[in-house]
Each structure stands twice: as structure tokens, then as C-alpha cells.
Amino acid sequence: MKKILLLSLIIIAGCSSSSVPIGMVKIKGSDTMLILTEMLAEEYMSRNPGVSIYVEGGGTSAGVKSLISGEVDICTASRSLNPDEAKSLADYYGSLGMYFLIAKDALSIYINPDNEVKNISSEDLKKIFTCQITNWKELGGNDAQIIPIIRTPNSGTYFYFKEHILSNEDYCPTALVANTTEDVIKIIDKNKNAIGFGGIGYQDDVFHAYIDDIRPSENNARNDTYPITRYLHFFTSKTPSGVVKNFIDWVLSPEGQKVVQKAGFIPLWELSF
């Protein structure tokens, strides 16, 4: 599990015995939220010497499993719990736990910057990822095979896209499968004809396509003009207390939401700087 270390934590090791760690938080889950969660953890630890926050990706499903088993304090998730996960939580803990909306995300469609196609309709997007459209010329682009890239089934983004864009139809069987959002971007960066999807916070090396002539932007996502938006979650197995509660409260505060915005995601409300 990755530990984010800041100078403040290093300094503590050299302080007197009265300076002891005041708490630890373990977090695992959504790859979409990985960079965001790391940034939140880094900023919080810089403000709270003595707190150690461990952050790991692996996908929403993996995070939920670790939450149920008691391995982590917080599961980061880009989707809601499914019925089986909710039942497991209830069986283990006698309740469905707690969930917190911490940010909003526009699910972006990534294409190579050199691709001539810049706008895709929602209908055509579904056809691309179900193999009904297989050539860019059908969308006004070059005569080249479309290479769709999808996430692994342990990803919350995989299920969200399948439900909200594909209407629960099966993904194209020839689609490439990427383990993380960063892997999706790496493939698209090297292949002009590839297309994939992921969070709006990942801006480097790819073009975020317009969907139905609407750009994936903070304002368009906040007011739901952009057609593919979702909330990002923190799940806990019980009512949080101590340092876990303090961290979540800070994430939801104006200071925490400024980090959300800095990471490229959409704060829960408009912020004044």
C-alpha cells in the first residue's frame, strides 16, 4: 500500500517523545479518484503533523472488499454500492455503513489530439463501444479502424459507463482492456485511432471529446449540461470518528473542496478564492 509522505511526517520522527502520531487513515478504491485522494491526503497531512494517510487504488470493487474486511477505513468509489456489496456490509456490520459525496466528475471521452473527430453524439458513443460503429470515417474522420479501450470489471467507471451509456448492453468483445485510467491514456497517446473514457481530472496527453456538442467542463458538469456526470464517494463501514471523521470533514470543507478543484474535478459548490 502506498504511503504518502510529506516533510511534516519526516520532521516528527526527529522530535521529542512528546510528539507522537495522533492517527492513521487507510484508504483504497477508485483509480479515477487516486490522484485526487493523494492530493487531499498530502494537503491534510501538511496541515496536521502526526497524521499518516495511506492511499491505494485498485478499483472501486477492490476498495469495497477491503472496506468490508476491515483492512481500510475509507473506500473511494466512482459509483454507488451494488446490491451484493450492500448486503455484505449489512451482514458484517449490521448496517449499510456511511457514504459521503465529496466531488462531482464529468466522465470524459478520451481521444488522441491528432484525431480529426472532436465531437461524438451519445448515440454514436454507444455504437462505438458495442461494435456497431467500427471505423472513424463513419463519424467524419479518417478511414481507420476504431480501437475502443475499456476498464476492467473491478472498476466503478466500467459499470457506470455500461449502465449509463450502453444501457447495460455488453461491451464490444474486441475492445482493449486497461487496468487503470493512466493505462487508458497511455494507449490513446500512442494510437491516433484509440478511444477510451475516464475522469475529467486527467488532462494530459489526450483530448476530451465534446459529447452532443457539449464540452466536458466544470460549469457544464456542475449544472448537468454535459450529459455524462457522476458523483465521487467516500464509503465507511460505520459512522466515522476520530481522525477519519476529521479528515472527511476537512475534505467537505471549503479548503478541502479547493483541492478537489485543483485536482481537476468539480467541487460540490462554487468556491470563492
Features from the language model and the residues they span:
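Sec-dependent N-terminal signal peptides
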Residues: 4-13
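Exported/periplasmic ABC-transporter solute-binding proteins
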Residues: 15-273
